[in-house]
A protein has these predicted regions:
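Phosphate/NTP-binding elements of NTP-utilizing enzymes
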Residues: 1-172
Length: 172
């Protein structure tokens, strides 16, 4: 919540809680600081699975204060779908990095990029999906961009490159 920090990079081993950290950010913003949120997954299929398994079934259904703020997509006139959920003061859009239409046209304050080393080089012919997502937050003075991933190939890893550009804090 420190407005002086706009970007956070988490480079970590597999299955060590990176995605869980993103879910906590989502829950915080739904409940305490409503904002437009974009969650970027490597593919549209992974976005759908993340929304169903982690956001809806895990986060929302197991947290009463969040469940009452985000209506079930099956509810009449909820305005919610699997990949887009509205809550008072904000919304969350969950998209695939391979889908240029999901990365266009809406202002986003909180950008959450999961498993960035699995993203395609370009979202269709539109360009780098991380840069496209970053542009969505340009108008917010208090934006947050969080990149998380397990690194893949040295010197070809998006998360390694982002970590090298950061102040490289380590928490033990």
């Amino acid at each position: 919540s420190d407005s002086s920090i706009q970007e956070v990079v988490i480079m970590s081993g597999a299955q060590l809680g990176k995605t869980e950290a993103l879910l906590n950010v989502i829950g915080y913003h739904i409940d305490n600081d409503p904002s437009p949120i974009l969650v970027l997954q490597p593919t549209l299929e992974m976005a759908q699975a993340f929304s169903k398994d982690r956001v809806a079934a895990g986060l929302l259904n197991s947290t009463p204060c969040l469940k009452e703020k985000v209506r079930d997509p099956r509810a009449r006139d909820s305005g919610n779908t699997t990949l887009h959920k509205i809550f008072p003061g904000g919304a969350i859009s969950i998209v695939g990095a391979n889908s240029p239409s999901g990365l266009a046209s809406r202002p986003i304050r909180v950008v959450l990029c999961d498993e960035v080393d699995r993203y395609p080089a370009s979202a269709g012919s539109e360009g780098d999906p991380i840069q496209l997502a970053r542009k969505r937050s340009a108008t917010f003075w208090n934006r947050k961009i969080i990149l998380v991933s397990t690194p893949t190939n040295k010197d070809a890893s998006r998360i390694e490159e982002a970590f090298e550009r950061s102040d490289q804090r380590r928490y033990y």
